[in-house]
């Protein structure tokens, strides 16, 4: 099966605590995440693209903004009450630690939902960008450090 593949990378500052970890990662700490979004399609649009990178960026922007300077926590974390005082920048994961793998799956689900929700995105200047009907989200790769990443693949 032949297809075209595109990728867009985003960077965001983010914190988490791995409540089940036996060593240092059980303490609140942060990362400069690099998020790679990979989409694919079988056909090119009338501009000879799978999808304009600007359209993909606009679809992912809300998800990246939700992560920006957020603290991700397990909803069952015994220290949740104290850490939740951070306020609206807390991102809770239902009964699981916010590992790189869990985060990649969450981002995938958020982006996939947004891709399905609307096929036209509009810029602040009024320009319209089409999300092609055949565009599929393939995977999300999250780099936690320059040498460590986890990914969630939604297509086989």
Regions found by a protein language model. Give the residues of each.
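Charge-rich, low-complexity N-terminal segments
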Residues: 1-156
């Amino acid at each position: 099966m032949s297809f075209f593949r595109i990728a867009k990378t985003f960077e965001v500052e983010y914190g988490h605590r791995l409540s089940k970890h036996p060593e240092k990662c059980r303490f609140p700490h942060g990362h400069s995440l690099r998020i790679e979004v990979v989409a694919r399609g079988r056909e090119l649009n009338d501009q000879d693209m799978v999808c304009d990178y600007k359209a993909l960026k606009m679809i992912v922007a809300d998800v990246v903004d939700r992560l920006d300077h957020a603290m991700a926590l397990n909803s069952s974390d015994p220290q949740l009450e104290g850490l939740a005082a951070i306020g609206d920048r807390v991102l809770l994961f239902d009964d699981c630690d916010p590992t790189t793998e869990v985060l990649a799956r969450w981002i995938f689900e958020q982006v996939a939902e947004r891709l399905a929700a609307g096929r036209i995105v509009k810029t602040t200047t009024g320009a319209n960008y089409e999300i092609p009907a055949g565009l599929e989200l393939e995977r999300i790769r999250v780099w936690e450090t320059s040498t460590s990443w986890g990914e969630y693949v939604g297509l086989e």
